[in-house]
């Protein structure tokens, strides 16, 4: 059974289920969608993504949630809160990934805004963060639409990431 976490005017955010594998694979194994990641995910990586979120739900009560279109129930991405290593510190991050067939429709912003509000209402976070490569202008725009501002850039391996609070 699918556990709905929150709803917006157009979207339903719910916990992932194993049956989301193919929809998730379409997103995170796509070269264009994942061009700001080290590499797209293979089948084993997609399963690890799901398992990581299943584990996050149990351990923390949050994670990335599947995004469905409210009208059709179609899976279009994920958004939510995860703990991420940002400049040497584990911090709560607002993350979002949307199927490229649904880009430029405000889905990432709407889902991330709902996740942000839900997190502040249900957990005692002082702040939420987003981080992305300096080149990832679309993700930066989504973070800014949530009211986030740049606080620093830092070097992490081979990428310079922008941290927005």
Segments and roles (model prediction):
Residues 21, 43-44, 52-54, 79:
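Short linear motifs in intrinsically disordered/low-complexity regions
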Residues 53-66:
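A short helix-loop-beta-strand connector motif used in the catalytic cores of GNAT acetyltransferases and
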Residues 1-35, 68-165:
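Acyl-donor (CoA/ACP) binding surface of acyl/acetyltransferases
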């Amino acid at each position: 059974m699918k556990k709905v976490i929150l709803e917006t005017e157009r979207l339903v955010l719910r916990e992932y289920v194993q049956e989301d594998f193919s929809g998730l694979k379409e997103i995170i194994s796509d070269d264009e969608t994942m061009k700001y990641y080290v590499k797209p995910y293979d089948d084993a990586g997609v399963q690890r993504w799901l398992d990581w979120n299943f584990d996050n739900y149990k351990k923390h009560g949050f994670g990335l949630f599947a995004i469905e279109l409210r009208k059709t129930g179609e899976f279009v991405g994920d958004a939510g809160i995860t703990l991420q290593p940002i400049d040497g510190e584990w911090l709560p991050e607002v993350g979002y990934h949307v199927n490229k067939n649904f880009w430029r429709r405000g889905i990432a912003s709407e889902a991330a805004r709902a996740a942000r509000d839900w997190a502040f209402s249900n957990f005692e976070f002082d702040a939420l963060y987003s981080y992305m490569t300096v080149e990832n202008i679309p993700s930066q725009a989504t973070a800014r639409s949530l009211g986030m501002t740049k606080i620093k850039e830092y070097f992490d391996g081979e990428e310079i990431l922008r941290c927005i609070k």
